[in-house]
UniProtKB/Swiss-Prot annotation:
GO molecular function: 2-isopropylmalate synthase activity; acetyl-CoA C-acetyltransferase activity; manganese ion binding
Domain called Pyruvate carboxyltransferase: residue spans: 8-271
Compartment(s) where it occurs, according to its Swiss-Prot or TrEMBL record: Cytoplasm
List of residues binding Mn(2+): D17, H208, H210, N244
SMART domains: LeuA_dimer
Keyword Amino-acid biosynthesis: yes
Keyword Phosphoprotein: no
Protein name as annotated: 2-isopropylmalate synthase
TM ranges: none
Catalytic activity: 3-methyl-2-oxobutanoate + acetyl-CoA + H2O = (2S)-2-isopropylmalate + CoA + H(+)
InterPro entries: 2-IPM_HCS-like, 2-isopropylmalate_synth_dimer, AIPM/Hcit_synth_CS, Aldolase_TIM, LeuA/HCS_post-cat, LeuA_allosteric_dom_sf, LeuA_bact_synth, PYR_CT
EC nos: 2.3.3.13
Length: 546
């Protein structure tokens, strides 16, 4: 049996695999904001990124290791392919963290070996001990992943895992890379690994999975029953293609059905000890932060964090809930941090009151950031009678999107009506050369006119592929949250903004998306799975040194 920590370890990969979602690229400040919130949430491991991908990715992982990693905080992990330069870059990036981990991987399925790596099984059996040993010479905590494990030959998989553990791996990760398996198959795979790998008791078994068939969470729960003790997941289930296993769904399944799962951890069914270290009351806030910063809306019927997760439309259901919530609800909404708290903040509220409420909500802002947030609060309070927690969340989440901006919106004005052509006048500041330019454009509607004017000013080729708007709170004076997604060279970039004027919000969201596009082109990142490991700069060395 694999090493058992006595509970489930939550490995969050929102900042690495989650960021690989189309349009979900994040800047440094956004990654830091999410990392801080993940630490408050109580995750055991934060996979902060893929340091070798680009200087920007390296810097982000390094900064998270420096300011989020701590003796009492989460382990800070970086991803590295089974290559000396990848592993070295990963080590240098995570080095400031007191608790650090190198996560290295190589594919083990025949389809990946033949068509992607162009390597033989013998090649892999040589690379694994060499690269895991090299990583072990740098840090003690080593995670090794057998990419596409669920489609690998089991006997070869056992051999690779045994070699990795012998070479120093302390966690063995079993990915269902393409979301191919069913729960019974995945559970059996974990059971068979426990049974057939002689030294498996020296490592923790981890699982990683994608949601291509909608089975990722179910697969993970079955894996946990069969000995997996680390679950790799993302907030809101974001990730490549159909996404990853959802952190909030996994955690709440283990929380609500604890009496069922306890026996698989050697506990009595009525044991009150939590199965994870997650502070569940932070789930909703974390979900909203990730949604706002990535520009990826949460579907209304999403389990746990969707807008309809605790809503009841049927009269029969409403009657039952009014009499006793347990009739139709298995989770108390307050358990995941969802409440109806409406605070008495308005235009007469002072800086200290706003700071106190933000601190109660878990936000730790610097003096400069607090000043900026308070200025935005006062601006909003002049237009909105009551400021709610959701309004404050929108203010703070939008604020961290401001760094790395080549373009800043200075002024927007629109003219439209049933008998006139929608016309927009937009003034934009270029922060690189400190110039200010104005353009006028006509569109099919006010938002289209604004986007046409911005395109004329920026001259950045793009295609608008999504525009969505939703109300943050109730009331005619509510903030409107706008999400815009644009495409350039088959890559998608998201922008998000909130304002009581949805046209202004749309303008800011479009500018945010354009800024992401501009800075993404400067990063020139590589992909950990799709880019060629045989590039000379990625070449595996025969005698790796520190």
């Amino acid at each position: 049996m694999s090493k058992d920590p006595g509970r489930i370890l939550i490995f969050d990969t929102t900042l690495r695999d989650g960021e690989q979602s189309p349009g979900a690229s994040l800047n440094l400040e956004e990654k830091l904001a999410i990392a801080h919130q993940l630490a408050r949430l109580g995750v055991d491991v934060i996979e902060a990124g893929f340091p070798f991908a680009s200087p920007g990715d390296f810097k982000a992982v390094n900064k998270i290791a420096e300011v989020v990693g701590g003796e009492n905080g989460p382990i800070i992990c970086g991803l590295a392919r089974a290559s000396t330069n990848d592993i070295k870059a990963c080590y240098e990036a995570i080095s400031p963290a007191p608790k650090k981990r190198i996560h290295t991987f190589i594919a083990t399925s025949d389809i990946h070996l033949k068509h992607k790596l162009r390597k033989t099984r013998s090649d892999v059996l040589c690379i694994v001990p060499e690269m895991v040993s090299y990583a072990k010479s740098l840090v003690d905590d080593i995670e090794f992943s057998c990419e596409d494990a669920s489609r690998s030959d089991p006997e070869f998989l056992y051999e690779v895992i045994q070699l990795a553990i012998t070479s120093g791996a302390t966690t063995i990760n079993i990915p269902d890379t393409v979301g191919f398996t069913t729960p019974s198959e995945f559970g059996k795979l974990i059971f068979d690994i426990n049974k057939n790998v002689p030294n498996i008791d020296e490592a923790i078994i981890s699982v990683h999975g994608h949601n291509d068939l909608g089975l990722a969470v179910a697969n993970f729960l079955e894996a946990a029953k069969n000995g997996a003790r680390q679950l790799e997941c993302t907030i809101n289930g974001i990730g490549e293609r159909a996404g990853n296993a959802s952190l909030e769904e996994l955690v709440m399944a283990l929380h609500v059905r604890k009496s069922f799962f306890n026996s698989f951890f050697g506990r009595s069914s009525d044991s009150p000890t939590p199965l994870t270290a997650i502070r569940t009351e932070e789930i909703t806030k974390t979900s909203r932060l990730v949604s706002n910063l990535t520009g990826m809306n949460v579907q209304p019927n999403k389990a746990i964090v969707g807008a309809n997760a605790f809503a009841h439309e049927s009269g029969i259901h409403q009657d039952g809930v009014l009499k006793n919530r347990l009739t139709y609800e298995i989770i108390d909404a307050k358990t995941v941090g969802l409440n109806d708290n409406k605070i008495s903040l308005g235009k007469l509220s002072g800086r200290s009151a706003v700071r106190a409420r933000l601190e109660e909500m878990g936000y730790d802002l610097s003096r400069e950031d607090l000043n900026d947030a308070f200025a935005r609060f006062k601006e909003l309070a002049d237009r909105k009678r009551e400021i709610t927690d959701r309004d404050l969340e929108a203010i703070v989440s939008e604020q961290v999107q401001l760094p790395e901006s080549k373009f800043q919106l200075s002024h927007v004005q629109v003219s439209c009506g049933s008998t006139s052509k929608p016309t927009a006048t937009v003034t934009l500041i270029n922060t690189e050369d400190h110039t200010e330019d104005t353009a006028v454009a006509i569109g099919t509607g006010p938002v289209d006119a604004v986007c046409e004017a911005l395109n004329a000013l920026t001259k950045v080729p793009n295609e608008l592929i999504e525009f969505s708007v939703k109300s943050v709170t109730e009331g005619i004076d509510a903030l409107g949250e706008v999400t815009i997604r644009i495409r350039n060279k088959n890559k998608i970039y998201s922008g998000h903004s909130a304002d009581t004027d949805v046209v202004v919000a749309a303008a800011n969201a479009f500018v945010n998306a354009l800024n992401r596009l501009v800075f993404s082109e400067k990063k020139n990142s590589i992909h950990p799975q799709f880019d060629d490991l045989e590039n000379p700069k990625n070449k595996v060395l025969s005698n790796p040194k520190k």
